[in-house]
């Protein structure tokens, strides 16, 4: 085959991630097959097939991904939960999730050694039966592939005992432990039992060499940069300072513009854009659903993909970005933790990728401070500490825009980057605009920007603040401190990754490396003072670079503690001691 016409094989296993990449690849590359191997360890759970069911419903014409279920009766350390299923049950399970063409090859049907149990070891068959079983697998694979590439959704299921041909059988075959060395009898016996002649090994090598038409680096479409639709100048709208605007809505307008310019662009969200003040996205790009309904902005050709499973939302968006497409995942912060591991998988892969690919972008709204209800389910800003820890990876950037202007600057900046993971955290409530567009862009590019500084005063109190809503009590505290004769500087920490020292971050180890860090002179101009107080509506992790570098002799942090059911943002801030009075008192004590 010609170069760049093959898909890439991916693995789902119990981790339940591989299917997202297969679906993303199939969506970006019609006519190219994307197989994905899946172990049966998770098949008794809804994890893997749940996401595929939603995809099959949303994209009924995209069939060019092929799940390959390795049904061997065991998980990692126990029997698989579907170990007792019959072949008919397993076939029905897949058909119930939209896979009408089930190709199931059961090794037991070829067994001539009278093995016990539903799962048998094909490597102990006679040579003729081994060839027959192998031939059946190859024939089923070819048929399944042809179906998948011709618009008929298919799955290939290979059923045989786990550990066939290796050192142990069942779940015990899953891992190699310290005792499993070449000196161990069970290892050496296994190698002798399955030894091949030199000619047979050469045949294996030849098959691998020729598979797919050549080396994957030359033939796999995912090894090449995907040509993207050009984007026009974004319709950035500069709001006047002190004007009250909704950051999420301002962001949504830019997302809508990107989708209108790029037909392959996909927005993923767990059915909550409108509740997050981003109805403008649904209105412009439409929710993808087989039922046309203008009341809900839904159409079969929509660009807004809305499974309720956050893992499926993040999975498709991350897979599209990794494979070269544009996407954005929009989430309630409260349930995002269910999906973040696949984002970490993708950002790690992007760090090692041999080509450029658009950065993975996500935005979290309905944050803890404004989601007062159900404190035990809807207030989980602790995930921001996860983002903060990943800043040291070298290619992960949590962004904390301070207003509706800066969130536009944040997305504008993100769209111009490659091989990075970018999480934007913002509010869905009307909040004061505190930056010009020039200041907003400066804060994102350099890492921080001054929002306010007293014209006069005695000792200086610096507030280093992440986010937008947390600024409300900070500006109130400023009035109290100025009345007491102090000078106050309020700094928006918008892109804390840029505030680290170069040696703090593994930036030089990643693809598309970024060594832009704020120098000491600019940092000190922002954060020097008699007292520095870090303030955040979330956890304290994102403020680490400021606390590491500040020369202020007295410093403190006022951050999120825990959620509680309240009626207003002010009440939840008071519950967490994030009030103007508390901030002014803390500063006064530090000054004393």
What residue spans do the PLM features occupy?
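Active-site metal-binding loops of divalent metal-dependent hydrolases
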Residues: 36-42, 73, 160, 272, ...
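Active-site glycine- and acidic-residue-rich loops that bind
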Residues: 42-48, 133-141, 244-248, 401-408, ...
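Thiamine diphosphate
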Residues: 1-35, 203-432, 443, 492, ...
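Loop/helix-junction capping segments adjacent to catalytic residues or to phosphate/diphosphate-binding pockets
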Residues: 45-46, 275, 336-337, 471-472
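Acidic/histidine-rich catalytic neighborhood of metal-dependent amide-processing enzymes
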Residues: 44-55, 342-345, 408
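Conserved catalytic-core segments centered on acid/base and nucleophilic motifs
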Residues: 34-37, 41-44, 314, 318-320, ...
């Amino acid at each position: 085959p010609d170069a760049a016409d093959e898909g890439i094989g991916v693995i789902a296993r119990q981790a339940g991630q591989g299917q997202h990449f297969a679906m993303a690849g199939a969506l970006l590359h019609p006519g190219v097959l994307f197989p994905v191997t899946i172990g049966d360890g998770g098949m008794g759970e809804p994890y893997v097939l749940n996401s595929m069911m939603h995809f099959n419903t949303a994209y009924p014409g995209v069939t060019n991904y092929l799940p390959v279920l390795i049904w061997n009766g065991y998980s990692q350390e126990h029997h698989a939960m579907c170990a007792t299923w019959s072949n008919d049950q397993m076939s029905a399970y897949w058909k119930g999730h939209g896979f009408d063409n089930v190709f199931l090859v059961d090794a037991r049907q070829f067994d001539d050694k009278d093995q016990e149990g539903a799962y048998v070891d094909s490597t102990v068959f006679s040579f003729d039966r081994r060839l027959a079983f192998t031939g059946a697998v190859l024939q089923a694979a070819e048929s399944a592939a042809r179906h998948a590439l011709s618009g008929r959704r298919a799955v290939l299921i290979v059923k045989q005992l786990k550990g066939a041909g290796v050192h142990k059988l069942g779940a015990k075959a899953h891992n190699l432990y310290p005792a499993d060395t070449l000196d161990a009898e069970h290892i050496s016996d296994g190698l002798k039992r399955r030894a091949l002649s030199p000619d047979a090994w050469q045949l294996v090598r030849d098959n691998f060499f020729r598979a797919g038409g050549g080396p994957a680096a030359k033939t796999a479409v995912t090894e090449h940069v995907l040509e993207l639709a050009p984007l026009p100048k974004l319709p950035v709208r500069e709001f006047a300072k002190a004007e009250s605007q909704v950051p999420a809505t301002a962001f949504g307008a830019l997302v809508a513009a990107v989708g209108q310019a790029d037909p392959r662009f996909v927005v993923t969200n767990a059915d909550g854009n409108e509740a997050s003040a981003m109805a403008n996205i649904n209105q412009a790009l439409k929710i993808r659903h087989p039922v046309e309904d203008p009341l809900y902005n839904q159409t079969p050709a929509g660009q807004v993909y809305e499974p309720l499973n956050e893992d499926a939302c993040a999975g498709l968006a991350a897979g599209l970005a990794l494979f070269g497409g544009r996407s954005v995942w929009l989430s309630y912060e409260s349930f995002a933790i269910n999906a973040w591991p696949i984002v970490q998988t993708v950002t790690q892969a992007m760090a090692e990728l041999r080509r450029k690919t658009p950065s993975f972008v996500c935005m979290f709204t309905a944050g803890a401070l404004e989601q007062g209800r159900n404190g035990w389910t809807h207030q989980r800003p602790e995930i921001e500490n996860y983002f903060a820890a990943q800043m040291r990876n070298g290619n992960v950037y949590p962004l904390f825009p301070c207003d509706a202007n800066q969130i536009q600057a944040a997305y504008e900046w993100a769209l111009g980057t490659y091989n990075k993971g970018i999480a934007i955290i913002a509010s869905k409530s009307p909040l004061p605009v505190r930056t010009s567009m020039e200041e907003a862009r400066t804060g994102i590019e350099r890492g921080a920007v001054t929002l306010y500084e007293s014209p006069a005063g005695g000792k200086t109190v610096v507030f280093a603040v992440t986010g937008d809503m947390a600024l409300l009590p900070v500006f109130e505290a400023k009035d109290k401190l100025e009345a007491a004769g102090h000078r106050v500087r309020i700094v928006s920490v918008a892109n804390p990754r840029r505030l680290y020292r170069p040696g703090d971050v593994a930036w030089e180890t990643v693809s598309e490396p970024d060594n832009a860090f704020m120098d000491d002179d600019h940092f000190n101009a922002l954060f020097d003072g008699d007292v520095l107080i870090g303030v955040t509506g979330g956890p304290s992790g994102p403020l680490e670079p400021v606390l590491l570098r500040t020369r202020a002799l007295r410093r403190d942090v006022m951050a999120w503690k825990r959620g509680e059911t309240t009626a207003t943002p002010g009440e939840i801030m008071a519950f967490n001691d994030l009030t103007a009075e508390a901030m002014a008192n803390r500063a006064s004590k530090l000054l004393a």
